[in-house]
Curated annotation (Swiss-Prot):
Keywords: Hydrolase, Metal-binding, Metalloprotease, Mitochondrion, Protease, Transit peptide, Zinc. Its cofactor is Zn(2+). Zn(2+) binds at residues 570, 574, 577. Binds 1 zinc ion. PANTHER family: MITOCHONDRIAL INTERMEDIATE PEPTIDASE (PTHR11804:SF79), PROTEASE M3 THIMET OLIGOPEPTIDASE-RELATED (PTHR11804). The keyword Hydrolase applies. It catalyses: Release of an N-terminal octapeptide as second stage of processing of some proteins imported into the mitochondrion. The active site is at residue 571. The gene is OCT1. Cleaves proteins, imported into the mitochondrion, to their mature size. While most mitochondrial precursor proteins are processed to the mature form in one step by mitochondrial processing peptidase (MPP), the sequential cleavage by MIP of an octapeptide after initial processing by MPP is a required step for a subgroup of nuclear-encoded precursor proteins destined for the matrix or the inner membrane. This is Mitochondrial intermediate peptidase. GO terms for cellular component: mitochondrial matrix; mitochondrion.
Length: 790
């Protein structure tokens, strides 16, 4: 049951899109070479902010873009009372984790004891709240410790965070095998008076917890449950070995240097010795060969080597898949996919495959149209006699690059200034804040920190202020590069929303603690808000946004390329879900929702990033304050999205492969993952995959996203529908319409995971056809399609 509490938060929120893009492109943050200091342009009155709001709006840009302003802003910190990391008053020093863990386990033991001895109707009515509190207490340590161990630059803090993480994780696993928690929750659920007293949110959390208890073996005999535990551990170990040990069958290729015509001369020279060029199949030079080398046979050899994983890698993958199939059957499920999808919007693998096939059919004409253009290029290439009337897999990159090079050449001739000059970090965040204010009535306000509150000197704290509710969340922005920092953008929810009732404060009055008040003791000294209508406090969602942008080089700010701007909007979409999804119960707050709807807020935010009305809020030249020339951006986006349908086809094929691998096929003694891979590509790929390749050995997402790889495609289709149907694709001011923003907030965001995703979707689209979910609704979403050319 309590496994769930680490489901979305025990690791940073890094979506599949973020990982794919960071692997394809190491971010390049261009800076506009100029000697002038970034000017402080006064905020325009058109944004409709109050005087204080305008001051906050201006400060938001300056804390990121103006070095002298930031230094002055930080100085206010030194006069304040010391605080622990993110305001947690236990963590003023590394050893504070010891007290934090000790107190947490004491409080958890108290909750377990209370649940275990529940007898009366009133006791059982509080059962869900009590178990949710237990989840929250454990998550407070697990989530924060996991964040500190991966992000904090201080080695001693890292060491103590690792110890805290493992101690509490082990304690949590003990609770997972404690039948009394399951028995008491089931008893409470079976009492009509109790069940009817629960809110819809409580009923959903009860169902989630019951499903998770059952999934992890509670209710089974001891021997079977132990086998489940052992299988789960073995899957985790083999899966990690698979991801960490991925290697090609052929690590290096050798060619005569004269055969590499078309490759960048400097790169070719660096790779060549005594007339022989060595190409590593796991590094960027192999991709360069596929894109630029004229010799089709060299490209063919390179493609086959790049797409063929080693035998040991394939063996580890197949072992993981077989173990997962065994785990599912031992747990009473037909397949691992059935087990995984039970609590997702899709519900069944049949529904997922229905969605994928509908999406495949919708995208097929555009995929073939793009392929036809590449074929025309190949037919016009007088030097190619290699299958002249067929597009081969090793040709696609080469002719796509030729097409893009033509577009790039025309683009550069028209470009008088760098696009990045219009996208400083501060102006982009200022634009996001203005967008949030227009649509949802919330804005980002820079806040001085207390000594010890942030883990690195360059971290900025932004308070999220609602125009009706005041302070509603805290966002820490760790956006700039430093040694040892992960290059992957990530959204961490360090503390979730949860309602703290008067009864809990009463309990804290009778517990010894170091704090000045019961509410501080209940929240480890962190920020809360008071809800007068409910006479209760709410934990403020506390979020960390991690990026790896280049540091500003005074006097100019850090400037972002198009990919970085889109990434920042995407990650702020996750943050928005946490900010507005402030539920009473922690288990369903913010991003703690079904995996196949979790990416919706972030993907939808990408649609806003380059909408003309939204661009008018922020895209201005860092030095001259001139507005962005829209034609310049449109040309750049046309180039960046030119390969969109080819990439979409690739993602559909991988999602289909994921479902096939998590069906009952691995239970067959003759199971061969390579045969399944080639069968999938033979049936559906527009360009045939060469015989003998084994690319599935490089499909690392099979471990972390097993049976759910379709989710990002699913959310792209939904986001596209909402962008068109609710926000009118930005036309007629739709992207800034408060009424439309409130509709989306009230039907989707504010629920977190506390409402059925199909009901959310039907509400925001005002389309009852999809409200019931099921295979028919999945087919309908697939038919909506994805406009991959935008």
């Amino acid at each position: 049951m309590l496994k769930r509490l680490a489901r979305n938060n025990s690791s940073p929120w890094i979506c599949s899109r973020c990982l794919q893009q960071s692997q394809r492109q190491r971010r390049f943050n261009s800076t506009f070479a100029a000697t002038a200091t970034a000017r402080d342009h006064a905020p325009s009155a058109l944004y409709g902010l109050s005087a204080s709001g305008k001051t906050d709006d201006d400060a938001l840009r300056k804390v990121f873009d103006n070095a002298s302003f930031w230094e002055s802003f930080k100085r206010g910190t030194s006069n304040k009372k010391p605080s622990g990391i993110i305001g947690n008053k236990y963590l003023t020093h590394p050893d504070g984790f010891i007290d934090f863990v000790t107190v947490t386990i004491q409080r958890c033991n108290g909750v377990v004891e209370k649940v275990s001895r529940a007898e009366t109707i009133e006791d059982f009515k509080y059962m869900v709240k009590d178990l949710d509190k237990l989840s929250d207490l454990l998550c407070r340590v697990i989530d924060l410790a996991d964040f500190v161990r991966s992000t904090h630059p201080n080695r001693q803090f890292q060491i103590m965070a690792v110890k805290a993480y493992h101690t509490v994780f082990q304690y949590m696993n003990q609770l997972n095998t404690t039948p009394v928690l399951y028995d008491q929750l089931k008893k409470a659920s079976d009492i009509p008076e109790v069940f009817e007293s629960w809110t819809e949110e409580e009923r959903i959390v009860a169902r989630i917890l019951m499903e998770d208890f059952a999934r992890f073996g509670i209710g089974l005999d001891d021997a079977t449950r132990q086998k489940l535990v052992d299988l789960s551990g073995e899957i985790a170990e083999v899966g990690s070995q698979f991801v960490e040990g991925m290697s090609p069958e052929t690590p290096t290729l050798k060619f005569e240097s004269k055969r590499l015509k078309g490759l960048d001369p400097n790169l070719a020279k660096a790779l060549t010795k005594w007339g022989e060029t060595r190409i590593s199949t796991m590094h960027h030079e192999a991709q360069a060969v596929l894109r630029f080398v004229d010799d089709a046979e060299v490209r063919r050899e390179t493609y086959s080597a790049v797409r063929t994983a080693g035998s040991s890698t394939i063996a580890r993958l197949e072992k993981m898949l077989k173990l997962r199939a065994e785990l599912a059957q031992l747990s009473g499920y037909e397949t691992f996919s059935h087990m995984t999808l039970e609590n997702k919007m899709a519900k069944t693998p049949e529904a997922v495959n229905t969605f994928l096939k509908a999406l495949y059919e919708d995208s097929r004409p555009s995929v073939l149209a793009d392929l036809h253009e590449l074929m025309e290029l190949k037919r016009g290439d007088a030097h190619q006699d290699n299958f002249p009337n067929r597009m081969n897999a090793w040709d696609k990159f080469y002719y796509t690059q030729k097409m893009l090079s033509t577009m790039e050449g025309a683009y550069k001739q028209r470009t008088a200034d760098s696009l990045s000059a219009y996208f400083s970090v501060g102006t982009v965040l200022q634009g996001i804040s203005r967008l949030f204010d227009r649509l949802y009535g919330v804005r980002l306000v820079p806040q001085e920190t207390q000594p010890g509150e942030v883990w690195e000197d360059g971290v900025r704290r932004l308070d999220v202020i609602s125009d009706t509710e005041g302070h509603i969340a805290v966002l820490y922005c760790d956006l700039f590069s430093r040694p040892g920092k992960t290059p992957n953008p990530a959204h961490f929810t360090l503390r979730c929303s949860r309602e703290i009732l008067p009864a809990e404060l009463e309990e804290m009055q009778h517990m010894p603690h170091r704090f000045s008040s019961p509410i501080e003791a209940a929240t480890d000294g962190m920020s809360v808000s008071y809800n007068a209508s409910r006479n209760s406090y709410f934990q403020l969602p506390t979020i960390a946004l991690i990026c790896d942008f280049s540091k500003p080089s005074s006097p100019r700010p850090t400037l972002l390329n198009i990919h970085d701007v889109r990434t920042l909007f995407h990650e702020m979409g996750h943050a928005l879900h946490s900010i507005l999804g402030r539920t009473a119960l922690q288990n369903v707050s913010g991003t703690r929702c079904a995996t196949d709807i979790a990416e919706l807020p972030s993907v939808l935010m990408e649609h806003f990033a380059f909408d003309p009305s939204v661009l008018a809020l922020y895209a201005r030249h860092w030095d001259t304050n001139a507005p962005l020339p829209l034609a310049l951006l449109e040309n750049r986006l046309a180039i960046d999205n030119r390969n969109g349908y080819s990439e979409l086809e690739s993602q559909i094929l991988l999602a289909m492969l994921d479902q096939a691998y998590h069906s009952n096929l691995p239970l067959d003694p003759a199971f061969n993952s390579t045969s399944v891979y080639h069968n999938t590509y033979t049936r559906f790929a527009s360009v045939p995959e060469p015989a003998g390749t084994r690319w599935q050995g490089f499909f690392g997402h099979l471990f972390g996203y097993g049976a759910t790889y379709y989710s990002y495609l699913f959310d792209r289709a939904i986001a596209s529908r909402i962008w068109k149907g609710v926000f009118n694709e930005g036309r007629d001011g739709g992207s800034l319409d408060r009424e439309k923003g409130e509709l989306y907030k009230n039907e989707v965001l504010r629920w977190g995971g506390g409402r059925d995703g199909w009901v959310c979707l039907a509400g925001v689209l005002r389309d009852g056809k999809v409200g019931e979910g099921g295979e028919g609704a999945m087919r309908e979403v697939g038919k909506w399609g994805i406009d991959a050319g935008k």
